[in-house]
């Protein structure tokens, strides 16, 4: 009888020792910790909700091709880049306002004010004044300021990105190019004006030259020589019927 009592007492003590002492020692995956899983799910749901709200307030980023030309205005140019500039051309101007054209379109004047990064430059396009005595140009040309040039061909023949707007000292400057083109390849029915059509073939064509402009190379601004239209000239060739 005593042996049976001892056996029951030992079984009771073993059962007490085998029971869990607290919920702190229970593994995270057990049903004893539903608060952790519920909290995690609640946080995940809240994060997804916040992400959806953020997408509604902030539009999706644009594609790379859409940012190719717009990103140039966001690049801040170091002022030292203009101090190191060489081979300045009177046909390239940085200004916050459209540059003026002279009344007779024979000269180009850059104003030396706070809105311009260029020095006071005046380029004469005529060596003598034009008198009203029937003087005409061989070819008719037109000169304009180009304010939206985005691409150009550099001196190596590669197509480069031209910076339209330049951010410098908390100001945005527009890069202008003074270009000259032919109005008409044939000012007269025979070709160029004043050419003997009996012995010569002639036509007017636009020629170009290289000027130093601010371009983009990766995410940095750099000076490069690019090609722009600068003149209208007459091309002549002797007629074949004169030979023989």
From Swiss-Prot:
Gene3D superfamilies to which the protein is assigned, alphabetical: Cystine-knot cytokines (2.10.90.10)
GO biological process, one term: cell surface receptor protein tyrosine kinase signaling pathway
Entries under SMART domains matching the protein: NGF
SUPFAM superfamilies the UniProt entry points to: Cystine-knot cytokines
Swiss-Prot/TrEMBL keywords: Cleavage on pair of basic residues, Disulfide bond, Glycoprotein, Growth factor, Lipid-binding, Metalloenzyme inhibitor, Metalloprotease inhibitor, Protease inhibitor, Secreted, Signal, Toxin
Signal peptide: 1-18
UniProt entry tagged with the keyword Disulfide bond: yes
GO cellular component: axon; dendrite; extracellular region; extracellular space; synaptic vesicle
Location in or out of the cell: Secreted
Chief location of this protein within or outside the cell: secreted
Tissue-level expression: Expressed by the venom gland.
Glycosylation sites: 148
Disulfide-bond pairs as recorded: 139-204, 182-232, 192-234
PTM summary: N-glycosylated.
Keyword Amino-acid biosynthesis part of the UniProt annotation: no
Propeptide: 19-125
GO molecular function: growth factor activity; lipid binding; metalloendopeptidase inhibitor activity; nerve growth factor receptor binding; toxin activity
InterPro entries: Cystine-knot_cytokine, Nerve_growth_factor-like, Nerve_growth_factor-rel, Nerve_growth_factor_bsu, Nerve_growth_factor_CS, Venom_nerve_growth_factor
PANTHER family with a match to the protein in the record: BETA-NERVE GROWTH FACTOR, NERVE GROWTH FACTOR NGF -RELATED
Role summary: Nerve growth factor is important for the development and maintenance of the sympathetic and sensory nervous systems. It stimulates division and differentiation of sympathetic and embryonic sensory neurons as well as basal forebrain cholinergic neurons in the brain. Its relevance in the snake venom is not clear. However, it has been shown to inhibit metalloproteinase-dependent proteolysis of platelet glycoprotein Ib alpha, suggesting a metalloproteinase inhibition to prevent metalloprotease autodigestion and/or protection against prey proteases.
Subunit structure: Homodimer; non-covalently linked.
Other comments on record: On the 2D-gel the determined MW of this protein is: 17.5 kDa.
Similarity comment text for this entry: Belongs to the NGF-beta family.
Protein name listed in UniProt: Venom nerve growth factor
Organism: Macrovipera lebetinus
């Amino acid at each position: 009888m005593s042996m049976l009592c001892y056996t029951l007492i030992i079984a009771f003590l073993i059962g007490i020792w085998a029971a869990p002492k607290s919920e702190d020692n229970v593994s995270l995956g057990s049903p004893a910790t539903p608060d952790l899983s519920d909290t995690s799910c609640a946080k995940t749901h809240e994060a997804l909700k916040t992400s959806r709200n953020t997408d509604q307030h902030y539009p999706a980023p644009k594609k790379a091709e859409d940012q190719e030309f717009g990103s140039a205005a966001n690049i801040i140019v170091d002022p030292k880049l203009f101090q190191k500039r060489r081979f300045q051309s009177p046909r390239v101007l940085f200004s916050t306002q459209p540059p003026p054209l002279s009344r007779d379109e024979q000269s180009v004047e850059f104003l030396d004010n706070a809105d311009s990064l260029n020095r006071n430059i005046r380029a004469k396009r005529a060596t003598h004044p034009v008198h009203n005595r029937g003087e005409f140009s061989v070819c008719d040309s037109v000169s304009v300021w180009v304010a939206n040039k985005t691409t150009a061909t550099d001196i190596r023949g590669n197509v480069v990105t031209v910076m339209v707007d330049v951010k410098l000292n908390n100001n945005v400057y527009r890069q202008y190019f003074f270009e000259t083109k032919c109005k008409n390849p044939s000012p007269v029915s025979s070709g160029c004006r004043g050419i003997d059509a009996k012995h010569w073939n002639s036509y007017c064509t636009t020629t170009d030259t290289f000027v130093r402009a601010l371009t983009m190379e990766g995410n940095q601004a750099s000076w490069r020589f690019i090609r722009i239209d600068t003149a209208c000239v007459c091309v002549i060739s002797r007629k074949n019927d004169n030979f023989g």
